[in-house]
C-alpha cells in the first residue's frame, strides 16, 4: 500500500481525493488544504470541500496559511509518506518537502504546457478553445513545469461553463490519476519533459477582467460570460451599477456596442461589436440572480430599445 499526503482545496480536488480513498492501493495519511475562509454576503466561515471530505473519513487535516517554514510542514514531513498527490492546492510546495518523498505528482486542469497557473479552465473557455484536458505531472519548484506523465482531453461545448467543465475535468483527472499511478510507480510509464518554449499561462483573473467589453464580437463576449460562470461572474454597467450576466445566447442583430436592440416580455437582446447576445440569466445590483423574464417583469421594465449597457 502506497502511503500518501493529499493536497487540494476546491471540489475539483475533492473528486480526486474521493477516488484515492476508494482505492485500496493507497493509504491517505493526511490532507493539506487552504484555511477556512469567509464566503458569501454574510461572510460565513466555510470549510473547503477537501476538508469536509477528509473530516468525513476521519483524516488528519492541516491548513497552513503558508506551508513554507510552518510547524505544519514539519508535522507533515514527520508522517513519513511515500508520496504526495496535489490537485488545485493553491500554494507552492517547498523544495524540502518535495525532497522528503519518493514522488510528488499533480493533477493539473489543462493540456500542458498550455495554461500553467491557477485559472486554466477559465482561460480555455474565454479563449474559445475547442477542447480542455488534464495532465498528470511531476512536481517541481517552478509552477506547473514538471515532466508530464499522462494527459487526457474532452471537448468544450457551447453549453459548457467553468462550473460544468470543472466537474467534467475533475472526473477525467481522477480516473486518469488512478489509471496512471500504478504504471508510473512501477517505472513502466516514463515522464516526458514539457516543451517550455510553448508554455502559456493562466494567472488568477483580475477584477478588471470580469468586466465585459461589448465592442468585441458576440462570440467573444459569449465565451467571456461562460468563462466567468459561476465564478467570478462577468458584469457590465446598468445605470452606473454593476449588472452581472451569468448566461446568454448568441442572437441575430446589430447596433452600437452594448446597445439594447430588442426587448420583449421574455427577451433582452444586446448588440456587440459584431452580432448580438440575448441575455438569459442576470443579477442586478443588490438582487439575487434571476431569469431574464423575471428581470424584465420587475426592475428591468423601464429599459428601452436604444439604452446602452456598460455606461
From Swiss-Prot:
- EC numbers on record: 2.1.2.9
Q: Which UniProt keywords apply?
A: Protein biosynthesis, Transferase
Q: Where does (6S)-5,6,7,8-tetrahydrofolate bind?
A: 110-113
PROSITE patterns, per the entry? GART
Species annotation: Streptococcus equi subsp. zooepidemicus (strain H70)
Q: Which domain of life is it from?
A: Bacteria
In its UniProt entry, what is this protein called?
A: Methionyl-tRNA formyltransferase
Q: Quote the catalytic activity from the record.
A: L-methionyl-tRNA(fMet) + (6R)-10-formyltetrahydrofolate = N-formyl-L-methionyl-tRNA(fMet) + (6S)-5,6,7,8-tetrahydrofolate + H(+)
**Quick check: keyword Transferase in the entry?**
yes
